[in-house]
């Protein structure tokens, strides 16, 4: 009997060890299929819990308020020029690039920020919106859709879905929102996430629906990380290729690219087409990769970044 108990106990310990090893390996796999492995990746999101009705989403989970303040501290808040569209990273490692580009686009003086980013889970409708507010560093950011019933109705009459749950751990919106909350806490946001499969036709319809809001007091913030799964040198090369495609307005070609080029091909292509209809010209502000932040000795896969303005 004792031998049987010992055998069962050993089997139990073996199974427990296997479960722990499996759990550890799953915990190290990054935040999703479109993110690269390595130190520069985003952590796995926590399980989504139901938000408290009417409460803002805390930006602290995306970027700590003290880190936002540190990034913003050396940057001037006022710029003479303003932009209609700005493309920024949502990887917190490159928050200085995002902050600088937002400020250079005139974010301190805008009334509305339409933040459009990739749906990293790549689930649900091709376009999803939220009417939940955000809060960063004690500064609340109101959501335009919380009170603008006409815009919400116009958006959701098409194929767009209203789903606050999809935004609870979505850093493509949360990271830029954490910066905007401290740059311009009196502004409003309108968060939108798009699946990779977003078509140019769906993108055109989205911008057509948003047209009544797109004036000089609105800034479109396209939240995009560029190449994934490549070495530092290869990622630099992809940045050059992407810059050329964007400056040449090759939207159809961009829409067909994979995550070794960017994480939001459909959305970026739709944005490029909208910019062309408005006769806006792209200017590349900065190019970088995660290796630029992590040091020359970093030889694992990296994410790359571009900041772009459209005027």
Place the predicted regions along the sequence by residue.
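N-terminal secretory signal peptides that target proteins for export/translocation
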Residues: 1-10
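Short, hydrophobic alpha-helical membrane anchors of single-pass surface/secreted proteins
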Residues: 12-15
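Hydrophobic helical h-region of N-terminal Sec-dependent signal peptides
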Residues: 17-22
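C-terminal motif of bacterial Sec signal peptides marking the signal peptidase cleavage site
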Residues: 28-30
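Active-site histidine-anchored catalytic micro-motif
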Residues: 32-281, 285-292
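Long, Lys/Arg- and hydrophobic-enriched amphipathic alpha-helices
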Residues: 288-311
């Amino acid at each position: 009997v004792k031998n049987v108990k010992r055998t069962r106990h050993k089997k139990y310990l073996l199974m427990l060890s296997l479960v722990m090893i499996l759990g550890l390996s799953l915990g190290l796999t990054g935040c999703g299929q479109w993110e690269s492995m390595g130190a520069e990746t985003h952590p796995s999101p926590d399980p989504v819990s139901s938000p408290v009705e009417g409460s803002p989403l805390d930006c602290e989970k995306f970027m700590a308020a003290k880190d936002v303040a540190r990034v913003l501290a050396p940057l001037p808040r006022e710029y003479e020029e303003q932009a209609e569209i700005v493309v920024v990273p949502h990887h917190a490692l490159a928050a200085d690039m995002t902050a600088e580009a937002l400020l250079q686009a005139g974010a301190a003086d805008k009334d509305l920020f339409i933040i459009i980013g990739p749906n990293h889970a790549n689930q649900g409708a091709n376009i999803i919106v939220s009417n939940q507010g955000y809060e960063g560093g004690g500064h609340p950011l109101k959501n335009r859709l919380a009170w603008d019933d006409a815009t919400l109705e116009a958006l959701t009459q098409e194929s767009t879905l209203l789903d606050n749950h999809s935004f609870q751990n979505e850093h493509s919106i949360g990271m830029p929102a954490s910066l905007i909350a401290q740059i311009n806490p009196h502004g409003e946001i309108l968060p939108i996430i798009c699946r990779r499969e977003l078509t140019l036709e769906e993108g055109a319809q989205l911008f057509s629906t948003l047209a009544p809001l797109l004036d000089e007091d609105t800034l479109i913030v396209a939240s995009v990380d560029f190449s994934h799964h490549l070495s530092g040198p290869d990622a630099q090369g992809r940045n050059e290729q992407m810059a050329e495609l964007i400056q040449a307005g090759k939207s159809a070609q961009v829409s067909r690219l994979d995550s070794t080029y960017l994480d939001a091909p459909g959305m970026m292509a739709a944005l490029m087409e909208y910019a062309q209809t408005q006769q806006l010209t792209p200017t590349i502000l900065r190019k970088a990769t995660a290796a630029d932040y992590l040091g020359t000795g970093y030889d694992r896969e990296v994410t790359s970044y571009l900041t772009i303005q459209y005027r």
